[in-house]
């Protein structure tokens, strides 16, 4: 059963108050957009840095060579490697990370594992800032709380804003940042209502419908 509320703050307060699972539930968001998901030009995708982070360590792998190897290690990458790492993954090594970064001079060398990375949504992409010569800056940005988003086949964007241990104020800051970036990525061809509905919930909790989206962005 969905509970309706005009106030994002009230939604979040109720979610945190009613959370009853014996683990640290995440706070999830589902944004239903007024797009035609069958049209490629109306797909909405991008990245956003949540100002208060996501409440967990974001794992990053860097594929590169030369001086960038040491740069990536110093910047805190969880996995760093070159062609040897590519071959290990090709042979079945599991890659338990949230993001993959590569440098322009190495992008061609990850071709053998492009399908593996692509299937997990990890393929480096200049649009996401994950194919770059500034490896240290990319790692810093991602680990500060950067997440990816994209519309699914129903025109809905799913994401995480943090967890139930976050303060309501911090969750509101993340919510505002998330919705602002989605708004800035509105396709030119979309007419009429863009934000059809926004739902918030904890992992095991009820969904709360948030209205007056435009008021907070």
Curated annotation (Swiss-Prot):
Q: Which domain of life is it from?
A: Bacteria
Protein's UniProt keywords contain Signal: no
Q: Does the keyword Cytoplasm apply?
A: no
The record's CDD domains line, in alphabetical order, gives: Ribosomal_L1
Record GO terms (molecular function): rRNA binding; structural constituent of ribosome; tRNA binding
Protein name (Swiss-Prot/TrEMBL): Large ribosomal subunit protein uL1
HAMAP family from the entry?
A: Ribosomal_uL1_B
Keywords associated with the record? Repressor, Ribonucleoprotein, Ribosomal protein, RNA-binding, rRNA-binding, Translation regulation, tRNA-binding
CC terms in the record's Gene Ontology section: large ribosomal subunit
GO BP, sorted A to Z: regulation of translation; translation
Per its database record, what is this protein's job?
Answer: Binds directly to 23S rRNA. The L1 stalk is quite mobile in the ribosome, and is involved in E site tRNA release.
What InterPro entries does the annotation carry? Ribosom_uL1_bac-type, Ribosomal_uL1, Ribosomal_uL1-like, Ribosomal_uL1/biogenesis, Ribosomal_uL1_3-a/b-sand
């Amino acid at each position: 059963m969905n509970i309706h509320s005009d106030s994002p703050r009230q939604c979040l307060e109720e979610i945190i108050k009613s959370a009853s699972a014996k683990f640290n539930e995440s706070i999830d968001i589902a944004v239903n957009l007024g797009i035609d998901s069958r049209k490629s030009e109306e797909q909405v995708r991008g990245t956003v840095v949540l100002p208060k982070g996501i409440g967990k360590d974001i794992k990053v792998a860097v594929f590169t060579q030369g001086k960038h190897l040491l740069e990536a290690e110093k910047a805190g990458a969880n996995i760093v490697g070159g062609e040897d790492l590519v071959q290990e993954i090709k042979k079945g090594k599991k890659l338990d990370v949230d993001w993959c970064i590569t440098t322009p001079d190495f992008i061609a060398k990850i071709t053998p594992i492009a399908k593996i990375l692509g299937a997990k949504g990890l393929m480096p992409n200049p649009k996401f800032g994950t194919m770059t010569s500034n490896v240290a800056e990319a790692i810093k940005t991602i680990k500060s709380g950067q997440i990816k988003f994209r519309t699914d086949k129903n025109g809905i964007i799913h994401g995480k804003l943090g967890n139930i241990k976050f303060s309501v104020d911090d969750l509101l800051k993340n919510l505002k940042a998330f919705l602002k970036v989605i708004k800035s990525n509105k396709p030119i061809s979309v007419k009429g209502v863009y934000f059809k509905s926004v739902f918030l919930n904890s992992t095991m909790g009820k969904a709360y419908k948030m209205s007056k989206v435009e008021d907070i962005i």
